[in-house]
Amino acid sequence: MTDLSKKVRAWGRRLLVGTAAAVTLPGLIGLAGGAPTAGAFSRPGLPVEYLQVPSAGMGRNIKVQFQSGGNNSPAVYLLDGLRAQDDYNGWDINTPAFEWYYQSGLSIIMPVGGQSSFYSDWYSPACGKAGCTTYKWETFLTSELPQYLQSNKSVKPTGSAAVGISMAGSSALILAAYHPQQFIYAGSLSALMDPSQGMGPSLIGLAMGDAGGYKASDMWGPSSDPAWQRNDPTIQIPKLVGNNTRLWVYCGNGTPSELGGANMPAEFLENFVRSSNLKFQDAYNAAGGHNAVFHFDQNGTHSWEYWGAQLNAMKPDLQGTLGATPGGGG
């Protein structure tokens, strides 16, 4: 085979993969709000509160689901996927997370809303199918919300964790990169770890258009804008290593197991994001990182069954890293 033939075949494969992704990803990245699991919602009777937290940055109150871990307890912020709803956080809809972390000594914080937001401060109003609103989620999560929780719920404003799925997995890492005193722990589950690279901006734009009719350019500008690299976890590895942030990074390979998630969209998307996670691990190790747990299982699809299992598995690590005192909060 000639060099030219090899190049043609290589470009053909790339075009095929890119076309498949472009056709399939709208609604797939949003599968991070996918099918509910059998264990959806925690049992009634837990001390879960529904807070209305004022946000000057967003010009409205933001609903936050909250379960106390006791006075001066560290916080775990559980961040939702691209199709975040306005009634409940996806972690509550799809898992019994409040049950799992009851009396863990960790305060569980679930912000509600933020569809397609990447939990970022957007350049422009977030205009979609439901109209326009202001997205200043990074400001809310790193300033307004921790101040409110400290003043009203006796939650530590520092030494916290951010754990996110899909869209919010990269967000959790970025929050920790730029706010290291608040977030000493970041968990990323099935995220695209290099959103600024290659077709990332285009595919994210397609997915956001499908999940609410939003535009990626309203968020971070054109793909050439520095905001894309600023919000790229792989590019920000030096900050994470320098901060000595504790990381928990998970990604399956698109093969379902007995946990479930056996459907084409969930299988395709998990396989699609896996390579960016492997590259992230390589870059992290090359940068001298030594404070991370990587789980790249030989099964797992882009669905809540696997993310819930990871949240359960990381509980002792969260408690140890954040210095929780089990038994608090009820």
UniProtKB/Swiss-Prot annotation:
Note down the stretches annotated as region Fibronectin-binding: 98-108
Gene name, please?
fbpB
What does the function comment of this entry state?
The antigen 85 proteins (FbpA, FbpB, FbpC) are responsible for the high affinity of mycobacteria for fibronectin, a large adhesive glycoprotein, which facilitates the attachment of M.tuberculosis to murine alveolar macrophages (AMs). They also help to maintain the integrity of the cell wall by catalyzing the transfer of mycolic acids to cell wall arabinogalactan and through the synthesis of alpha,alpha-trehalose dimycolate (TDM, cord factor).
A Pfam family that this protein carries is: Esterase
Q: Return the similarity comment.
A: Belongs to the mycobacterial A85 antigen family.
The record's GO CC annotations read: extracellular region
* Transferase is among the record's keywords: yes
Q: Where does substrate bind?
A: 82-83, 166, 194, 272-275, 279, 302-304
- Tell me which InterPro entries the record gives: AB_hydrolase_fold, Esterase-like, Mycobacterial_A85_antigen, TAT_signal
Q: What is this protein called?
A: Diacylglycerol acyltransferase/mycolyltransferase Ag85B
E.C. code: 2.3.1.122, 2.3.1.20
Question: Which top-rank group of organisms is this from?
Answer: Bacteria
N-terminal signal peptide? 1-40
Reactions catalysed: 2 alpha,alpha'-trehalose 6-mycolate = alpha,alpha'-trehalose 6,6'-bismycolate + alpha,alpha-trehalose; an acyl-CoA + a 1,2-diacyl-sn-glycerol = a triacyl-sn-glycerol + CoA
Q: Which residues form the active site?
A: 166 (nucleophile), 270, 302
Keywords annotated in UniProt: Acyltransferase, Disulfide bond, Secreted, Signal, Transferase
Q: Which GO terms describe its molecular function?
A: diacylglycerol O-acyltransferase activity; trehalose O-mycolyltransferase activity
Disulphide bonds annotated for this chain are 127-132
Q: Where in the cell is it found?
A: Secreted
- Tell me where it mainly resides: secreted
